[in-house]
UniProtKB/Swiss-Prot annotation:
Organism field: Gallus gallus (Chicken)
EC category name: hydrolase
Chain residue ranges for the region called Disordered: 385-428
Highest taxon in the source lineage: Eukaryota
GO terms for cellular component: chromosome; cytoplasm; cytosol; histone deacetylase complex; nucleus; transcription repressor complex
Protein name, per record: Histone deacetylase 3
EC number: 3.5.1.98, 3.5.1.-
Active-site residues from the entry: H135
Catalytic activity line of the entry: N(6)-acetyl-L-lysyl-[histone] + H2O = L-lysyl-[histone] + acetate; N(6)-acetyl-L-lysyl-[protein] + H2O = L-lysyl-[protein] + acetate; N(6)-(2E)-butenoyl-L-lysyl-[protein] + H2O = (2E)-2-butenoate + L-lysyl-[protein]; N(6)-(2-hydroxyisobutanoyl)-L-lysyl-[protein] + H2O = 2-hydroxy-2-methylpropanoate + L-lysyl-[protein]
Binding-site list for Zn(2+): D170, H172, D259
C-alpha cells in the first residue's frame, strides 16, 4: 500500500547565511529542493510551506532566557550582548547572522508541523530536510545548531505516541536529543557516529545508556574512521531490527545527517549515497509512522544528491542516474550524476571483530529493557499548531516551479577547486 508522504519546504530557508567561510550552508536546502522539483518527485507528495515556530513553541524545550536572546540579538547589536553570547555559547561555531531567529523559526516550525500531521494521520511519512539540528541544548547553542527542532518535534509526538524511537545516522553524536530524553523510557535514542580522537562533540560511547527511568533507553554505536557501506549495514540493520522488536515504537524520527558520506568536508566515513539511503529504506520498511529530518552535511553538492535520492526512496519512485537540468546544474560538474564515486582512501578502521563486539554489547543492553514499556496516556492537549490551512499550496499548483528570490552570498556555494572555504580539503 502506497504511503502518504508530506514534504515541508520554505522557499526562504536556503537564503540564510552563517557567514563567509562557515561550513554550514543553508543554501544546500535550495539545491536539494531544486532537484526534488526537477525530478518530479513533488508529484508523489503533499507539499507544504511550513508553519513558523513561535518563541512559545521553542520554549517547550529551551529556556525562555535563551530563546529571548536568540530573538533579540543581531549582528548590529551583538556588542551589547557580550555576557549572553558567552553564556549561551553563541560565537564562532554558532555565529550571530542576519535573520538568525527567523531561520530557527522556519526549520523548527516544519519539524513541528510534520509531527502534528503524523499525529493526526494526515500522512504516514513527513520530510523536513531543513531540520535535524541535533546538538542544540536546553540552555545553549552547539555545533551549528541553535534550536533543537528534533526534541520539540518529539515532544509533540509524545502527545499521541506512547513510545518514540529516535535514530541518528549523522557522523556526529546526537548529543542534544540524547540529553533531553536521558531520564525517560518514552523515547529511545539510537545514534551511530564517529567516536574518539576528540571528534565533536566528544560524547556517545557505548556506556552512555540513560539513567533513572531511561536506563538502557539511550543506545550509542561508536564507530571509527573509514566505515564503508558493508560494515555499516552489518551493524545498522541488526541493531535497528532488535531495537524495534524490543521497544515496539509507535513512531520513529530519523535524522539523516549527510556528513557520514565519503568526501564530506567535515567527515571521515566512507558511505556511498546508496549506502546512506539503504538505512532510510530499511527504517521505512517497518511501516511505522516516520518523521524524516536532515542534519549535518558539508559537501553541499553531495548533500543535495543524498537527500534527493532518499526522497525518491520514501515515495517509491525510481529516478534517473543523470541529473535533470536546473538552475544549479553546474554545481554538479564534472559528472552531473546522482551517484558519483564518493569513496576515499581513508582506511576502514572498523574491523569485523570490533563491530561484532559493539553489536554484542548493544544486544546485551537491549535484554535489560522491559519489552515495550507501557505508559499512562493522559488527555491529549490541543495541537500545538493552529496554522492556517490556506497557507498550503493548491494541489493543482504544486507542479509549477515558483520563481523564488535566491540571493547568494559571496563564497556561499563554491564546491570545487576554487572553493574559497577550502571545501575540498578532504583526503581522497
Amino acid at each position: 500500500m502506497a504511503k502518504t508522504v508530506a514534504y515541508f519546504y520554505d522557499p526562504d530557508v536556503g537564503n540564510f547565511h552563517y557567514g563567509a567561510g562557515h561550513p554550514m550552508k543553508p543554501h544546500r536546502l535550495a539545491l536539494t529542493h531544486s532537484l526534488v522539483l526537477h525530478y518530479g518527485l513533488y508529484k508523489k507528495m503533499i507539499v507544504f510551506k511550513p508553519y513558523q515556530a513561535s518563541q512559545h513553541d521553542m520554549c517547550r524545550f529551551h529556556s525562555e532566557d535563551y530563546i529571548d536572546f536568540l530573538q533579540r540579538v543581531s549582528p548590529n547589536n551583538m556588542q551589547g550582548f557580550t555576557k549572553s553570547l558567552n553564556a549561551f555559547n553563541v560565537g564562532d561555531d554558532c555565529p550571530v547572522f542576519p535573520g538568525l531567529f527567523e531561520f530557527c523559526s522556519r526549520y523548527t516550525g516544519a519539524s513541528l508541523q510534520g509531527a502534528t500531521q503524523l499525529n493526526n494521520k494526515i500522512c504516514d511519512i513527513a520530510i523536513n530536510w531543513a531540520g535535524g539540528l541535533h546538538h542544540a541544548k536546553k540552555f545553549e547553542a552547539s555545533g551549528f545548531c541553535y534550536v533543537n527542532d528534533i526534541v520539540i518535534g518529539i515532544l509533540e509526538l509524545l502527545k499521541y505516541h506512547p513510545r518514540v524511537l529516535y535514530i541518528d545516522i549523522d557522523i556526529h553524536h546526537g548529543d542534544g536529543v540524547q540529553e533531553a530524553f536521558y531520564l525517560t523510557d518514552r523515547v529511545m535514542t539510537v545514534s551511530f557516529h564517529k567516536y574518539g580522537n576528540y571528534f565533536f562533540p566528544g560524547t556517545g560511547d557505548m556506556y552512555e545508556v540513560g539513567a533513572e527511568s531511561g536506563r538502557y533507553y539511550a543506545l550509542n554505536v561508536p564507530l571509527r574512521d573509514g566505515i564503508d557501506d558493508q560494515s555499516y549495514k552489518h551493524l545498522f540493520q541488526p541493531v535497528i531490527n532488535q531495537v524495534v522488536d524490543y521497544y515496539q515504537p509507535t513512531c520513529i524520527v530519523l535524522q539523516c545527517g549527510a556528513d557520514s558520506l565519503g568526501r564530506d568536508r567535515l567527515g571521515c566515513f566512507n558511505l556511498s549515497i546508496r549506502g546512506h539511503g539503504e538505512c532510510v529504506e530499511y527504517v521505512k520498511s517497518f511501516n511505522i509512522p516516520l518523521l524524516v529530518l536532515g542534519g549535518g552535511g558539508y559537501t553541499v553538492r553531495n548533500v543535495a544528491r543524498c537527500w534527493t535520492y532518499e526522497t525518491s526512496l520514501l515515495v517509491d519512485e525510481a529516478i534517473s542516474e543523470e541529473l535533470p537540468y536546473s538552475e544549479y546544474f553546474e554545481y554538479f560538474a564534472p559528472d552531473f550524476t546522482l551517484h558519483p564515486d564518493v569513496s576515499t582512501r581513508i582506511e576502514n578502521q572498523n574491523s569485523r571483530q570490533y563491530l561484532d563486539q559493539i553489536r554484542q554489547t548493544i544486544f546485551e543492553n537491549l535484554k535489560m529493557l522491559n519489552h515495550a514499556p507501557s505508559v499512562q496516556i493522559h488527555d491529549v492537549p490541543s495541537d500545538l499548531l493552529s496554522y492556517d490551512r490556506t497557507d498550503e499550496p493548491d494541489p493543482e499548483e504544486r507542479g509549477s516551479e515558483e520563481n523564488y528570490s535566491r540571493p547568494e552570498a559571496a563564497n556561499e556555494f563554491y564546491d570545487g577547486d576554487h572553493d574559497n572555504d577550502k571545501e575540498s580539503d578532504v583526503e581522497i
